[in-house]
């Protein structure tokens, strides 16, 4: 096939000339608009600005607002002095946004400055093992994330809700974190698990034995266990808890997480509640 090189070159030249004319036309139009804008009314100037720069302004405002919000939150962020999850519990006074008075009193006794630090009693986690509905599944996942991230110091809940977690090696052996004097004073309030049962549960999980059903001994009777380990402190009867929170089941117990960052504060809270109400274990 024969190509006419002369014709092809002429066509290219014509295209190039046209391309050069396009930017010139745009520039001429832009100059005309600027000239018209210079002599336009304020309303016309605003309309012109909004037409060409509206989205630039909107995006800039959003970015600035987000940056300002982040800086404000960071500057006013309080340190966590103590964080406990109240599993399957709810605040009785749902209309109040203030913490119960006993938390403020405890913080003061601990020397915790509320302007820079905070104590959190989280009642947002509800898990019903028998049904495992959507709320239970979501709460279970949330709880595991909190534990893995070292966010939690302790769990306060009823005996039934505590049982599964108490037998999963999540909580500290109280003998490892209490002084000799503290252990002697708190021993009447200990909640025990049998280490042999815990090991059997772990073995069944490793073998993926879904048919295994553990038999839990009475947590208040270590004499009936092969290897009793205190993992909880019974707070049943502490009116600061029962007057402010509703617990789904009977009894109240607190476990201190093995990876807790504020262990001493957790121990101090248990002592504060028990000493304040002179609780007799039932």
Task: Locate each region found by the language model.
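Short, Lys/Arg-enriched N-terminal segments with co-localized hydrophobic residues
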Residues: 2-23
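A bilobed periplasmic-binding-protein/Venus flytrap-type ligand-binding module shared by bacterial periplasmic
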Residues: 247-264, 281
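Early extracytoplasmic/lumenal segment of secretory-pathway proteins
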Residues: 78-80, 85-159
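Hydrophobic membrane-insertion alpha-helices, especially the h-region
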Residues: 52-73
